[in-house]
Amino acid sequence: MPFKKLSRRTFLTASSALAFLHTPFARALPARQSVNINDYNPHDWIASFKQAFSEGQTVVVPAGLVCDNINTGIFIPPGKTLHILGSLRGNGRGRFVLQDGSQVTGEDGGSMHNITLDVRGSDCTIKGLTMSGFGPVTQIYIGGKNKRVMRNLIIDNLTVSHANYAILRQGFHNQIIGANITNCKFSDLQGDAIEWNVAINDRDILISDHVIERINCTNGKINWGIGIGLAGSTYDNNYPEDQAVKNFVVANITGSDCRQLIHVENGKHFVIRNIKARNITPDFSKKAGIDNATVAIYGCDNFVIDNIEMINSAGMLIGYGVIKGKYLSIPQNFRVNDIQLDNTHLAYKLRGIQISAGNAVSFVALTNIEMKRASLELHNKPQHFFMRNINVMQESSVGPALSMNFDMRKDVRGVFMAKKETLLSLANVHAVNEKGQSSVDIDRINHHIVNVEKINFRLPELRE
């Protein structure tokens, strides 16, 4: 019952209705469509929310109202909605738990501070909120230790700032089938904007249309401070499906002022496309132990990276799956297309594009790449390697514009070299220094088939 004083008349009327309350008809009365939390006890918001959810389908926090001291867990019943126009505040220990069909929505600046939304059901929606606070590890947590299948998660139109992590998924114990995380702005975070960790059971994940700014871990935490990160479990060069994060798309991301924008470990069957990056440099998250790159891929199979525009930024790292110094896997079967990297006005050297690829049956295709004041470095040997429409310029004082290091025979990583039916195909590939002179370093060519057309350098003599 709403928190209001009862007059003697109201009290007598209520008392006369007590017998009626025990009838089956009374017990079957549906919850009201909407209740206002302002009608409940303001001295105990925890109890008030629990009562409100028992009485209404939607609990509304009206504009101008601040509900503070939300410092414990509150379960939103299945199918019910928390709609926020005012503000909810806690000390970091409070959370709202979403069950099947639960929704938390915001409007007109509706906000949450130091409170976690804990997703534990299917058909959940979180949208329209402003979220902040360094109290909890993350603003939205998706996971838990119970085995369950969660379907059709929607997270949309959030503004998250001045927090640790924004969205954290721990996926080892459960499964998500279908998640759309869209149209959010993440800024001034210590941790990741989105971390999808050990998500080996998930599929059909869309992460798109986000703005990510100023991700800078200064608290000494290791591996914090990435824009968007997805990871499977243990690296394995056979790329088993049940150990990889898979079947996802990351698209339409605008990012700036962070150390690493997009990160994938042990993934397969994915697409990264339409990325615009500015100022992705080592000036951020200096002690977090993460590589500086706009896109960092480790030990992945069967993927596409398409339409990446980078300015004054570290470029791309596509490298081995490594644990404690042991090389466990190498990237294979991928295409990198429509890449622009312009570091013309950058005051210092940063990574250009570094690619390690291999395995006995594998392919790599690099197409439509333009790089200014940056290097393209290729390591190890995939079975079939294609390069088309490549233009690279790097200053001679820094090093060659294009490096091809195929000969790994004396390197422990040589175990990943393709050796049978190998193909190298180059067409319209130009690598120059600032004077327009050829700037290429190639160690050894021993591919079974070599096709070359319109390149501005000579290949080493073929060797057996």
From Swiss-Prot:
Pathway recorded for this protein: Slime biogenesis; slime polysaccharide biosynthesis
BP-aspect Gene Ontology terms: lipopolysaccharide biosynthetic process; slime layer polysaccharide biosynthetic process
Keyword set includes Protein biosynthesis: no
Organism name: Escherichia coli (strain K12)
Record's comment on post-translational modification: Exported by the Tat system. The position of the signal peptide cleavage has not been experimentally proven.
Keywords: Lipopolysaccharide biosynthesis, Signal
Protein name per Swiss-Prot or TrEMBL: Colanic acid biosynthesis protein WcaM
Signal peptide positions (record): 1-28
Record carries keyword Signal: yes
